[in-house]
Amino acid sequence: RQGKDANNGEFHESLNSLAAILGAGLVGIDKTNQDGYNYVKMVQNYFNSDNGWNIMMNNTNPAVANLGGGYGRDWWYDVLPNALYYAVCDVFPNVDGAERIQRSIAEQFVKADSVLNGNYDYSYFDYKNLKGYVNHIPMQQDAAGGHAYVLLCAYHKFGDPRYLEHCKSALEALISQKESRFYEALLPLGVYVAAYLNATEGTNYNVSKLFDWVFDGCQSSSGRTGWGIIVGKWGDYDVSGLQGSITDGGGYAFLMNSIKPAWPFIPLVKYQPEYAKAIGKWMLNNSSACRLFYPGDIDEKHQWAPELKNITNNNVSYEGLRKADDYGKESLKGVSPVAIGDGPKWIEGNPAESMFSIYSSSPVGILGAIITKTDVEGILQLDCNATDFYVDKPYPVYLYYNPYTTICLCTF
């Protein structure tokens, strides 16, 4: 946020607030009673009813939304806050007013899916007038995955069969695509829904196809071309598993996008364990590479602004990790990778400090809740229940992946 004085203190984004509250709750911090505040109650201010949309949105109102960030014009920005809010409400149940908001979100998503009727070929959707629009950004058909996830959570919470019906309808709209339409962060949620329904509802959705669409990325010239999972080494650093653009400047990974898929993918293996080895391998690589966004964990010569790293306390990361600098900084010529950010590009005169990103760092508690080190270097204990929301969890479930060619013994 820009502080209490700029724009009446109202310029802040729910993607930051919700992700931070979720991550904190997952690692045991009570955000309903911290420093004299109930942050979980406060975050309800992102519920937009005055504009008639009646869902959680990325900003509190349209006036500040025009200052930046997605709001009412970029579909994933309007769907993801609702998935995050449902997750927050499972971690922090029984907060006054939350159930009313959750019910409203579910009803709006049912109405939207009914109107869309299998056709998600839009850049964004007006949840007041129930109409889809195409603008200058690519169509985001993977918003259907976000709809499906929220409606599955709503079905678990409220038991309304309409929510399950439209969860399936949205998922079928996603699966009916002819190619990957991976846009930002919603497709992985759809993969989870497909696996869950296959295990619990007797469906036969093609989970492998959805995984391919995430990992191989969008290859359509009409979509967000190149958006997928990065594989390989940049210089001496292994960056396999990170998510972002496979093609932009040879590769451009983002921390937020690298963290978020762990939320649906790790619990998914409970429902389709044939993917356990692949997901375990991905998570080991991804979690290792995620450290490279933090200024205290990557060599200074690979950072755009190493002289500023102390302001982060190594809690706030760079927004991105590029294969090569795209600002033309002389000292970074031939250096790969480079910890970097887009902040200075958004508004002329933005300082280098804007490369450090709360937006990117806020969901890190998701990794904190899932990952525990074992007594064998390179073998992680991954908690498959940590981010499996609104389901019965009668016993602990952990995923261990052994990257070695020999048998290893871990202490449980």
Tell me the role of every PLM-derived stretch.
Residues R1-F412:
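Catalytic domains of carbohydrate-active enzymes that cleave complex glycans
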